[in-house]
C-alpha cells in the first residue's frame, strides 16, 4: 500500500485517484477555515504559485475535528479559500484525521510518519492543547495544518507540526523538486 493507491473525493464530490499525482512532490495538509492557523493558507498558495510548474502539488483536506473550526461544507470551504486567500491548489472533501472514522489516506500517513517535526513553537503548542483538554494519542494528528511532505516516488519523507509554517519548509520542498 502506498500513497498512489488511495482514491479521495474532491470538494465537489468527484473521485480523485492519487495515482494521478505520480511524479509530483506533494504537500498534504489538513486544514480549517476558522482556526488561528488559517492564515497559513496564504503562504501555502505562495508556495504553490512559485513551485507548481516545477512539480509541487498541494492537497488540502479540510477537517472539522479540532473544535469544529471547519463547519462549512467542502464546497463552501473551497469558495472561502479561493476568495479570501486566492487558493488554486486542490481542495478535497472534508475528512476525519483521527479516531474510528479516520480517512484511510490519513491512517496510512500517520502509520508511516507517526511523529511531528516541530519548531521552537511546537512544545508550547502541545502544552496549550493539553491545557484546553485536547488529549491526543500517540501518532494522532495534533491540530489543523499538520503537513506531510511526499517525494516524487510517493514516499512520505516528513511530517511537520501545525506550528511549522509553509515558509519554514520551503527548503525541504525545493530539495525534492
From Swiss-Prot:
The keyword Glycoprotein does not apply. The keyword Lyase does not apply. One of its GO terms (biological process) is cellular response to oxidative stress. Keywords: Oxidoreductase, Peroxidase. The active site is at 35. Pfam families: GSHPx. GO terms for molecular function: peroxidase activity. InterPro entries: Glutathione_peroxidase, GPX_AS, GPX_CS, Thioredoxin-like_sf. It comes from the Bacteria. PANTHER family: GLUTATHIONE PEROXIDASE. Belongs to the glutathione peroxidase family. Important in the cellular metabolism or defense processes particular to this pathogen. This is Glutathione peroxidase homolog. It comes from Neisseria meningitidis serogroup B (strain ATCC BAA-335 / MC58). The lineage of its organism: Bacteria, Pseudomonadati, Pseudomonadota, Betaproteobacteria, Neisseriales.
Amino acid at each position: 500500500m502506498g500513497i498512489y493507491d488511495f482514491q479521495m473525493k474532491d470538494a465537489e464530490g468527484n473521485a480523485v485517484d492519487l495515482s494521478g499525482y505520480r511524479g509530483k512532490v506533494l504537500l498534504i495538509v489538513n486544514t480549517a477555515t476558522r482556526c488561528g492557523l488559517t492564515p497559513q493558507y496564504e503562504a501555502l498558495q505562495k508556495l504553490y504559485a512559485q513551485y507548481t510548474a516545477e512539480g509541487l502539488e498541494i492537497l488540502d483536506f479540510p477537517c472539522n475535528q479540532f473544535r469544529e473550526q471547519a463547519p462549512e461544507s467542502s464546497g463552501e470551504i473551497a469558495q472561502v479559500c479561493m476568495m479570501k486567500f486566492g487558493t488554486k491548489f486542490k481542495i478535497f472533501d472534508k475528512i476525519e484525521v483521527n479516531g474510528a472514522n479516520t480517512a484511510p489516506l490519513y491512517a496510512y500517513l500517520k502509520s508511516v510518519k507517526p511523529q511531528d517535526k516541530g519548531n521552537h513553537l511546537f512544545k508550547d503548542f502541545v502544552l496549550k492543547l493539553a491545557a484546553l483538554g485536547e488529549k491526543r494519542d500517540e501518532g494522532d494528528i495534533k491540530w489543523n495544518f499538520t503537513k506531510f511532505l511526499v517525494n516524487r516516488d510517493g514516499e512520505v519523507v516528513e511530517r511537520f507540526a501545525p506550528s511549522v509554517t509553509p515558509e519554514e519548509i520551503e527548503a525541504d520542498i525545493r530539495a525534492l523538486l
